[in-house]
Amino acid sequence: MKKIIKFVALMLTACLIFTGCNETDTGEGQGSKVTGAVQNHDGSDPGTLKVYCFELGKADSFLIYNNEATIIIDAGERGQGKDILQYMENNDIKGIDMMFITHFDKDHVGGAAKLIGNTEVKEVYTPVYIKPSDDYDNFSEKVKEKKTPVIALKENTSFEAGGIKIDVNVAAKEIYEESPSNNSSLIIRVSYGETSFLFTGDAESIRLKEYIATKPEKCNVVKMPYHGNYTKFMGCLDEFLDLVQPEYAVITSSKEEKEADETKELIEKRGIKLFRTRKGSVLFESDGKDVKAVQMS
């Protein structure tokens, strides 16, 4: 049974566990159903949810925040943490409630040590599988220095914070023979009222098929797996897109390492609006019923 963790309770009980410009409106979303705007349990209004997709080349980082909570999924490469911190400063974001590292490749964990060292990060969540590297060592040393709780998720887990629901789907195996780091990726669904955002890390075919088998619900926005790669998926991208039916898709790619043309075609033939971070950062805003998007030039 999926383990449900309430964010407030988690703040009190978490312990250190560490192992080894165009604008478009959309229609209604497909997340958990509410009537009207998002409300907290006490009836207060947490405000507009913003999801900022950083332009970091072929690297991932997504800052998710409203008036009451801040969540980050991945932290880009080493040297890119400063860009995230600058955005936080510019937008008066004082700290991070939850950091999720989808997997330990350098383009997802590289900037994490900088963030942890320079702003308050209350908790970090990771997969079980560790990919040894200098970036991992820097991350490990910094969380120990700051006494930041790190929890390796071993089962599907849900969180709530500031009216935001986070559902984390974990890999079925602790280690895979093929692409063990990519296929350890946490797949994270963020829901806000009737709207939802799906983040797939660098999941390859094996991992994506696991997730497809859960029959995921539709979402408003999907971050395409593995930087828009096509050859790693053996046709399952079609099935994935047919299930989640997003209005928007985001690909994290660079001018030097672009997404596959085949992936772009799969997205566009379905009428999905495609954003590529190599063309600029992307900001999504949700009021709990509708999603708006703008790409920064």
Can you describe what each PLM-predicted range is?
Residues 39-44, 64, 155-163, 188-190:
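Short acidic-hydrophobic surface loop/beta-edge motif
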Residues 24-53:
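N-terminal, intrinsically disordered, polar/charged segments of Gram-positive cell-envelope systems
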Residues 66-67, 192, 285-290:
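Short acidic-glycine loop/turn motifs at beta-strand connectors
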Residues 23, 31, 130-182, 248, ...:
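Binuclear metal-ion centers of metallo-dependent hydrolases, dominated by the metallo-beta-lactamase
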Residues 53-61, 67-69, 73-90, 100-117, ...:
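Active-site-proximal loop/helix segments of hydrolase catalytic cores
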Residues 127:
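Divalent cation-coordinating acidic motifs and surrounding scaffolds
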Residues 1-6:
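Positively charged n-region of N-terminal signal peptides that target proteins for export
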Residues 16-20:
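C-terminal motif of bacterial Sec signal peptides marking the signal peptidase cleavage site
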